[in-house]
Amino acid sequence: MPISRRNFHLFLGAAALGGATSSIPMSAGLKTAADQKGSAPYFFKDRTFETIFLTSLGRAYHSGGNPGKILYLTRQVKDGDFESAFTAFRQAGDEARGQAEESLAGGHRESARQAYLWAQNFYDSATYFADGSADPSRFLPAWEALYDCWVKSLPLFDPPIEPVSIPYEGTMLRGFYMRGKSKERQRPLLILVNGSDGSLLDMWLWGGAGGTARGYDCLTFDGPGQGYALWKQKLYFRPDWEKVIGPVVDFALSRTDVDPKRIAIQGISQGGYWVPRAIAFEERIAAAIADPGVTDVSTSWTATLPPPLLALLKAGNKAEFDSFLEKALPPASRATLNFRMRPFGFTSYFDTYKATLDYNLRDVANKIRCPLLITAPVNEIYWPGQSQQLYEMATSSSSKKLVEFTEADGADLHCEPQSTGIRDLRVFDWLDQTLSVKG
């Protein structure tokens, strides 16, 4: 059947989100799966806006945001207006960074640390609206401000977060080592793996804060296609994530303070694919968490493609596939899709969509042997049903658990954005028991 622009916009959905590979997916005016599903909104009818604001609010649990300011911003932003959202969050970030610098100059280190975390929250939120705004080029300066605040916050933690360099295929990945409260000479370690466009702040808030408080050391990093590795090192996604995690584990084992028998790993958002893929090959991992389980990344790109476009993809018709998308997408949506393609390292729509087909666990999930916890948030929009699929596919896991998060918990939606507390409780209680940690 012919593909009209109207039908294309109705069908494209999550594909325009670039696979919804982060804890905070976005679009630029397209109708998406996010518009059709989910719990009743608290603030915005536009599911993109709702998700980003809920995530921003959820970050406050571990001092990553000022709830009153976030609630104030919900009244300053027009539903669906990307320009107003970008401006509001960017200005809030500048304001919080100014507060941090003023506190630091006055010797108030804890106040400065918290304000730098607030600034990161606001700057990161701004980046998700940049591509649908009047000037998408403002993304990179906002990201650079976010990263600058992260770096400046590190020495203000107690103990300080330690910047580390992880050898990786002839270069170095930037990593960050978070010391836990345990006084053991060798401590359990939780490796924190991000999605595609999550911030380092989220690695602190969705694992680091809860882990260090319970006696775990934590290690996070920007891997290929993520953060600094993407924007400054030009390293791109790869489906064989065990080639990334192997060097990270090598680095961890080079430290005398890491207990080699108690190394765990957690992946959030698309990290729910990275981690199961890695542990299918990496046998030095003692336990793993996938939040949520992702068995096939490509479905969030291809599931809502109209059948004729899907046929072009399967037939390998690159020229026609690219030509249609280039003509059919309005400027804001094209900017969003082009941005979402960058972590894959391609400029062709066809090449990117085709590459996503390699990101699946079909032939490897049955090789997972370590204990595995898989979160299953109700109203998971981007990979619905895949947590259950991963649970069923991991037939060789020595112990596996599927943990549901519901609306009644206040913890539904992709990566439980507004409920890091209940998430920490369930994830770390399981991990404590699995690794015999007294958290």
Regions found by a protein language model. Name each.
Residues 395-411:
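Catalytic histidine neighborhood in serine/cysteine hydrolases
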Residues 7-28:
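N-terminal export signals
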Residues 236-256:
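Alpha/beta-hydrolase active-site loop
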Residues 280-347:
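Hydrolase active-site cap/lid region
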Residues 408-421:
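Catalytic histidine-centered segment of alpha/beta-hydrolase-like enzymes
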Residues 143-182:
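N-terminal cap/lid segment of alpha/beta-hydrolase-fold proteins
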Residues 381-386:
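Conserved alpha/beta-hydrolase "acid-adjacent" motif
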Residues 368, 374-376:
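Short beta-strand/loop motif that positions the catalytic acidic residue
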